[in-house]
Swiss-Prot record:
A biological process from GO: response to estradiol
The protein, known as: 5-hydroxytryptamine receptor 5A
One Gene Ontology cellular component: postsynaptic specialization membrane
Stretches in topological domain Cytoplasmic: 64-76, 138-155, 221-287, 340-357
Residues that, per the record, bind serotonin: 121
Length: 357
């Protein structure tokens, strides 16, 4: 005989076994959300500090150049141009980009402000990149052609490079607005980004990054070759010490004359040459680090910026933000690298702060 099933006890026991699992899942979800919120706040705070530090450091460089008379000449005008572009990145670009991140990469500030932000972004970042290129070219010519590259020629060339830098940056940034070259704002999806038109993508990425990248890599290769040639020529102009004596006889004219040379060293290097070589080595090292940091900061962004529209490939929003802010950070590193390898700036900073007190 079949036993009756206790439906009441069954129905009461089932929820009791599921309730702890639900509470555990809810608690884990809350913990995960609170952790992500705390992490997001930390990241956004760090980005805010990055923008403030970029503004402060570049403004300090600009103020020093303006206050110290000895800096009113090349190559400090190139450094001033770079500092201006990096200050503008910190003032006009980073704050709105931070607002964009706070709103989950949704643009809620309207079409006009979107167009202005994108134009400033492209203008300032492109100018910063080309200013790095101009400094690298100036260092290359001063190292390899220091006799021809006189102060007058250097001033003229640097002014032309500054003019071309800002003119090219303006053309690249304003092209979508002036010629209707793609759309930067989408009201439906609340997106604000650089025009995804394939032809503009090629034009802007080549003009803003790939062309200056080729220039700086070529420049550093030439600087490296010049430094290697200098080291080789210095070795050929010296006689190293030898462990044993060497006798040289001239049997044709003076059979009785014997010259003995022991542990001899002959060099044809003056103190001025040594000082110049040390200065050139510091300049070459500075240019190398400046170029290396520039490539590390901007290469991931511009690779994805070129591939994404051409291949219809949407990268995750998180990686877009990482690559974009990594590029912005180059504006923070530029003045640090340049002033670290220029002793005159450290003394100028001391004079500047002493006057403020």
């Amino acid at each position: 005989m079949d036993l009756p099933i206790n439906l009441t006890s069954f129905s009461l026991s089932t929820p009791s076994t599921l309730e702890p699992n639900r509470s555990l899942d809810t608690e884990a979800l809350r913990t995960s959300q609170s952790f992500l919120s705390a992490f997001r706040v930390l990241v956004l705070t760090l980005l805010g500090f990055l923008a403030a530090a970029t503004f402060t450091w570049n403004l300090l460089v600009l103020a020093t150049i303006l206050r110290v008379r000895t800096f009113h000449r090349v190559p400090h005008n190139l450094v001033a141009s770079m500092a201006i572009s990096d200050v503008l990145v910190a003032v006009l670009v980073m704050p709105l980009s931070l607002v964009h991140e706070l709103s989950g990469r949704r643009w809620q500030l309207g079409r006009r402000l979107c167009q202005l932000w994108i134009a400033c972004d492209v203008l300032c970042c492109t100018a910063s990149i080309w200013n790095v290129t101009a400094i690298a070219l100036d260092r290359y010519w001063s190292i390899t052609r220091h006799l021809e590259y006189t102060l007058r020629a250097r001033k003229r060339v640097s002014n032309v490079m500054i003019l071309l830098t800002w003119a090219l940056s303006a053309v690249i940034s304003l092209a979508p607005l002036l010629f209707g070259w793609g759309e930067t704002y989408s009201e439906l999806s609340e997106e604000c980004q650089v025009s995804r038109e394939p032809s503009y993508t090629v034009f802007s990425t080549v003009g803003a990054f790939y062309l200056p990248l080729c220039v700086v890599l070529f420049v550093y290769w030439k600087i490296y070759k010049a430094a290697k040639f200098r080291m080789g020529s210095r070795k050929t102009n010296s006689v190293s010490p030898i462990p044993e004596a060497v006798e040289v006889k001239d049997a044709s004219q003076h059979p009785q004359m014997v010259f003995t040379v022991r542990h001899a060293t002959v060099t044809f290097q003056t103190e001025g040459d040594t000082w110049r070589e040390q200065k050139e080595q510091r300049a070459a090292l500075m240019v190398g680090i400046l170029i290396g940091v520039f490539v590390l900061c901007w290469f991931p962004f511009f690779v994805t910026e070129l591939i994404s529209p051409l291949c219809s490939w949407d990268i995750p929003a998180l990686w877009k933000s990482i690559f974009l802010w990594l590029g912005y950070s180059n504006s923070f590193f530029n003045p640090l690298i340049y002033t670290a390898f220029n002793r005159s700036y450290s003394s100028a900073f001391k004079v500047f702060f002493s006057k403020q007190q």
